[in-house]
Amino acid sequence: TANRYHNADLPQREFDADKAAYHYKKSGHSGKIQLSASDAAFAGAVDAAQLMANSAAEAGIEIEVIREPRDGYWSNVWNNDAKGWCACYWGGRPTEDWMFSAAYTNDTDWNDTAWKGTDASAKFNVLVKEGRAELDDNKRREIYAECQRLIYDDGGTICPLFNNYV
């Protein structure tokens, strides 16, 4: 990875239909979940959304993929509370702080997972500020590793793929 403080100790999660079904039932949600997608988000986003829907169906979770027009996707669909869950793309950021601050802190307009209001997200917000100010490289690494663990355990990102930057 290009990120200096990448936490390589976090294992990649594998799809587990039984676990997905358990958590879906535990959530109290029932019925269809709508997923808005457009190839404006990234090339193949609609196909990726359909693949996710097919996998979710194995767990008894019905996802309705809504193909949105490319024109106006970022202003009319992405991060629009009325649309809810939607496909998006995050390009790499040069520093962990920039990525955390742009996408996950509770005070950013781009927090498209709406990760707010949990003990973990509150701790994350404090740690991001501490990490930004920390001059000791080893301490900063520990802080950012914990930030990544909090996102991994409590955040709302579903990341079906990673882009390879060469």
Model regions: which residues?
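Append "and occasionally in soluble cytosolic enzymes with long acidic Gly/Pro-rich linkers
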Residues: T1-N54, E58, K123-L127, E146, ...
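Secretory-pathway/luminal and periplasmic proteins that interact with or process carbohydrate-rich
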Residues: R4-P11, A82-C86, Y152-C159
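Extracytoplasmic/secreted cell-surface and envelope-processing proteins
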Residues: G44-D47, S75-N76, P94-W98
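Loop/turn elements at helix/coil->beta-strand transitions in domains of secreted/extracellular proteins
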Residues: H29-Q34, A57-E62, D81-W85, D154-T157
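Ligand-binding clamshell of periplasmic/extracellular solute-binding protein-like
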Residues: R67-R70, W85-M99
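Extracytoplasmic/peripheral linker and loop segments enriched in polar/acidic and small residues
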Residues: E58, E62-Y73, M99-V166
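Short helices/loops that flank or line small-molecule/ion binding pockets
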Residues: D47-A59, D71-K83
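Active-site-proximal beta-strand/loop segments in catalytic clefts of secreted hydrolases
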Residues: S36-A40, I66-E68, Y89-G91, L161-N164
